[in-house]
A protein has these predicted regions:
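Glycan-processing catalytic domains of CAZymes
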Residues: 1-141
Length: 141
């Protein structure tokens, strides 16, 4: 194992209680003692609180899905995010980068033009971007 990819820290968004926040910190602190890198997937509410109230010694990177793109599960279609959503995630990732984190984006798009736009957007902001044409991240359809 060369690092941890930690999912579900967005539980703090659903249950914004100090006990949840402290519990996530405890888990991350335990992982940090291994000397391995820690990348959080999502969890923007937790990460923003942590980075604005603590000295960042736990998080090496953050991954955010759907910064530029979006997936409409009800219609089963890939789309682009609206400007306000894009700006929100951009501010979040920029905050993380300003605290020493590497920012990753995971986008979902099939349209070649949207894929190029998403990659260019990530590159312009200094994010490492992966684009999948499959919401399930499967290799084959």
């Amino acid at each position: 194992v060369d690092g941890f990819f930690v999912d579900n820290t967005d539980v703090y968004y659903n249950y914004p209680q100090e006990s949840i926040y402290d519990g996530i910190l405890t888990i991350l602190d335990y992982m940090n003692h291994t000397g391995r890198k820690i990348i959080l997937n999502g969890g923007d509410c937790f990460v923003k609180k942590y980075l604005t109230t603590e000295k960042n010694v736990l998080i090496d990177g953050v991954n955010q899905e759907n910064v530029f793109t979006a997936y409409d599960f009800s219609k089963d279609i890939y789309t682009k995010n609206d400007q306000s959503t894009r700006e929100y995630y951009t501010e979040y990732l920029d905050l993380a980068m300003s605290h020493g984190c590497t920012a990753y984006t995971l986008e979902y798009a099939m349209d070649p033009t949207i894929r190029r736009q998403a990659a260019a957007y990530a590159g312009k902001h200094g994010y490492i971007c992966y684009i999948s044409d499959n919401i399930g991240l499967c290799l084959g359809r």
